Amino acid sequence: MFDKNNLKLYFICGTQDIESKTTIIDVVTEALESGITMFQFREKGNGALIGDEKEDLARKLLALCHDYAVPFIVNDDVALANKIGADGIHVGQDDMDVKVFAEQFKGKIIGLSISNIDEYKTSNLAHVDYIGVGPMYATTSKDDANLPVGPEMITKLRAHVNHFPIVAIGGINVENTREVMQAGADGISIISAITKSENISNTISQFLQNVE
């Protein structure tokens, strides 16, 4: 069951985002202990795991998230999400149409990326629980990221979607979080600000203060 409070501090990562001095299990464990509200497994890019290795890691992370009662979302990979019993799936505009797999995910969380008003107008949100809007600012975490749309895009979308849950993503850090929240976001998605942090617990504590 989806609760928009899950979006408050939504951590996204895969092995490609992790510094060599640590492991994804260690990073996600510390993030969970520190208070993230949802986790998305996004295994993409150079050196990303595939096949059985990807599935094995996904199962470990799923179990870890459930230890902390935090929803575990899979990015794009509908087959994997279905196979391991993930709590949900997040897809982009170029991925499979939501209505194609929505039947398989009844009772699960479905997220969709939207970057602008045109994408909103052509998206069927009937089966979608939340939309991810961005990138807010320039980001280095995604090789395929669009140009920044800024927090003002959230304000524009709010005029169309009313109270529909929105999570902001892209280049968000402790300093600009309040600006994003004031624009109308229900929460923030974070990758590198957590994975590259020297003190994950402290970073997450600051984020949680700023999303309130």
From Swiss-Prot:
Signal peptide: none
Cofactor detail note: Binds 1 Mg(2+) ion per subunit.
Catalysed reactions, semicolon-separated: 2-[(2R,5Z)-2-carboxy-4-methylthiazol-5(2H)-ylidene]ethyl phosphate + 4-amino-2-methyl-5-(diphosphooxymethyl)pyrimidine + 2 H(+) = thiamine phosphate + CO2 + diphosphate; 2-(2-carboxy-4-methylthiazol-5-yl)ethyl phosphate + 4-amino-2-methyl-5-(diphosphooxymethyl)pyrimidine + 2 H(+) = thiamine phosphate + CO2 + diphosphate; 4-methyl-5-(2-phosphooxyethyl)-thiazole + 4-amino-2-methyl-5-(diphosphooxymethyl)pyrimidine + H(+) = thiamine phosphate + diphosphate
Name of the top EC class for this enzyme: transferase
GO molecular function, a single term: thiamine-phosphate diphosphorylase activity
Listed GO CC annotations: cytoplasm
Keyword Transmembrane attributed: no
Needed co-factor(s): Mg(2+)
One Gene Ontology term from the biological process aspect of the record: thiamine diphosphate biosynthetic process
Matches recorded under InterPro entries: Aldolase_TIM, ThiamineP_synth_sf, ThiamineP_synth_TenI, TMP_synthase
One Pfam family here: TMP-TENI
Positions contributing to Mg(2+) binding: D76, D95
Function: Condenses 4-methyl-5-(beta-hydroxyethyl)thiazole monophosphate (THZ-P) and 2-methyl-4-amino-5-hydroxymethyl pyrimidine pyrophosphate (HMP-PP) to form thiamine monophosphate (TMP).
Name used for this protein in its record: Thiamine-phosphate synthase
Native species: Staphylococcus saprophyticus subsp. saprophyticus (strain ATCC 15305 / DSM 20229 / NCIMB 8711 / NCTC 7292 / S-41)
Designated gene of the protein: thiE
